[in-house]
Amino acid sequence: MRGLRLALQFLTRLPVPGVEAFSSVDLARSAAWFPLVGLLVGSIVALVTFAVDHRSAPLAAILGVLAWVWLTGALHLDGLADLADALGASHREPQRFFAVLSDPHVGTFGVVTIVFVLLLKVAALALLPIDALLCVPLILAWARLGTLAWGRWLPALKAGQGERFGWQIPGGWIVVWTMILLGASAALAPPLCAAPVVIAAWGAWLKARLGGMTGDCLGAGVEVTETALLLLVALTSGAMTIPR
């Protein structure tokens, strides 16, 4: 269970016994648990939203997204903000990309991007029918599976913890989790069967635009995938087959 504990420690703020010393190899092994962590965090988000939904759907959505951000420690939002700042600042000066990406301060592009992503999540969560909340854990699991795929298939652009473990991720786990999540999506939320397309599209964009990935690119990909899938389900809720 060391791998699961490390995955929870790395991806969430949940109070679990920590793993004090670990290597990139340990982190790569723990990656097999990332989608399960997504299912766990997504279940808590869905429960928070469900608990308040009977009073006010907008309030429930806001509290659900707040729980979402708190549980993950805004880890992936930080990566999204860093990537947005780097892309914005290097629009006219490409050589500035990595310098801005490594800057710990959040700039205008990062703030605006975070605000828009959070607003989109709140709006989409508020639109979901109450019985469609079962799709939220699947969305978070798909997004974390994306980190395994991008880390495995894309070359690292710089040396960092998020980059070093990528090539060591066991490819078999990607296949296993893809089959599990496709089966669950087909049974509960058919629109989520498009998740592999979203994951592949983000990977293709990173390859074409940057030539590879960094840890921030993985975090940004989680946010993009979550937001895209949540919007997809919210806008196609008539296609849901979730049993009542």
Labelled PLM ranges:
Residues 1-73, 89-96, 103-244:
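Hydrophobic alpha-helical transmembrane segments
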